[in-house]
Amino acid sequence: MSNITSASAAQIDHASSWNFRFAVFCSQLSIISTFILSVIAVKWIFTKSTFQTSTKIILVFNFVYANIHQFMYAIISLGMAYKGIFLLDETCEWLITEKDCLLYTEVLYVGISGMIYSQTGILIERAFATLYRNYTAKISRLVGIIISTFVLIMSIATYQIIISDDPLEGVVLSCFVPAQHSAQRANTFLFIALILTFVNLISSAAVMFYNKRLEYSIRYKVRERFKKREAIYSTHTICVVCMAQFVTMLVYSSGVLILRCNMSNILLTTFYKLITWVYTVQYNALLFPLILIFRIRATKLSRTKKIQDITSANQSQTEHYNQITSAWKIT
């Protein structure tokens, strides 16, 4: 590691501030929670859900990206916190060369881009499962593998594209920061992430709307409804998860982009204070297993309650028919 210069006063104040320490503390809680909830969620996906094979494949890959990000984010943020607590008298040791940061930043971007692309990928998969009438297990498995492979390739390639032709000769305060000469490409990535965030939201709403129309159109076709039951349930759950993650991804992509594009117009101390909280990817990663677990549990309890109500109540023929119809409508 080469020490070209010492950290600036603004950088020292940032890393040693209680604002940053509290942000790191909150982030570590979210990271630990993500690890625990991810294990539970993956187990539930295979034991308590009726997700189709393609959905399960993409969801598992999404969990991999989320936890890759959380692991690398924990290393980088704790390293920064360590400097701000124990190395205040050695600020010449703070700065890191861009080459030394390459692996850390690249892995971090694999996690970020993987989560974003996986959201788009799983919505494409849900649209395909909803629209395609003969969505067999073999086709489902093939679709899941193709989409997951494409997302993996794009995730690995993202940071390589950002730093292409960059000599990596500068220094950075931490490995959160992309290489200096690649700042414009990093901003382009944030803009693409912002667009994809809105596309995912609109797609979620559109697929949910079509899902409801499909459910209504086949409500009296018992055989067809049974065949589509898994697709209807899976689609609704996935869309709810994607829509819930919209806010955190919007804050990250738009917030970081706005701050980076206006660095010359604001104080560096203000920039550091804001960027600490605008970076919300770790909370987006936490929301993924949390909401998925909630949706799986809520749907299972709702179905169980409906079945118990039907089997325990004394009803007229009309009431019994109406309750069965209502039970079929639950996704």
UniProtKB/Swiss-Prot annotation:
Pfam family, one: 7TM_GPCR_Sra
Top-level taxon of origin: Eukaryota
Membrane topology qualifier: Multi-pass membrane protein
InterPro entries: 7TM_GPCR_serpentine_rcpt_Sra, Nematode_rcpt-like_serp_alpha
Subcellular location: Membrane
Chief location bin: membrane
Molecular function, one GO term: olfactory receptor activity
Gene Ontology cellular component list: membrane
Keywords: Membrane, Transmembrane, Transmembrane helix
Transmembrane spans: 22-42, 57-77, 104-124, 143-163, 189-209, 238-258, 274-294
GO terms (BP aspect): detection of chemical stimulus involved in sensory perception
Sequence similarity: Belongs to the nematode receptor-like protein sra family.
Full protein name: Serpentine receptor class alpha-1
Source organism per UniProt: Caenorhabditis elegans
